[in-house]
A protein has these predicted regions:
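Basic, Lys/Arg-enriched alpha-helical interface segments
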Residues: 1-69, 78-82, 89-131
Length: 131
């Protein structure tokens, strides 16, 4: 079964992971996209060394090219969609706390938006039944 993968969108409509991907050399970008495709195929069962848990539901897609490490922070939302939150390039093994905070904040914002959409849909559904 294929899983859905989507890019987190800022309030101003920008896609931060897409912007990060555009900064990568073409060869590396292709490899990162191939890992994203693996996530589409494997969903939450895709594990180390391709992905790993960061904190709670926050996970990372992992890729190393030479000495440089590339990561995409993501999580699975309640709609069973992997939301790509934050892309980073690093030379150290650990993900920096600042990057974790960015990923966590975007995850919380996405979940709040999803909750708002569901609440609005539930309210509309209740109103329609009373007509």
């Amino acid at each position: 079964m294929a899983w859905n993968v989507d890019f987190y969108q800022d309030d101003d409509g920008k896609l931060p992971v897409m912007k990060w991907l555009d900064t990568l050399p073409e060869e590396v970008r292709g490899k990162v996209i191939a890992r994203i495709d693996l996530l589409k195929e494997g969903g939450p069962t895709l594990d180390y060394p391709y992905t790993s848990q960061i904190d709670g539901r926050l996970r990372e897609i992992r890729l190393r090219v030479g000495k440089t490490r590339y990561r995409v922070l993501y999580f699975f939302d309640d709609d069973r969609t992997a939301i790509l939150l934050h892309g980073l390039t690093k030379n150290t093994p650990a993900v920096e706390e600042a990057d974790k905070r960015i990923g966590s904040a975007r995850m919380a914002k996405h979940e709040a938006r999803l909750g708002s959409k569901r609440s609005a849909g539930a309210r509309r559904g209740k109103g329609e039944g009373n007509k």
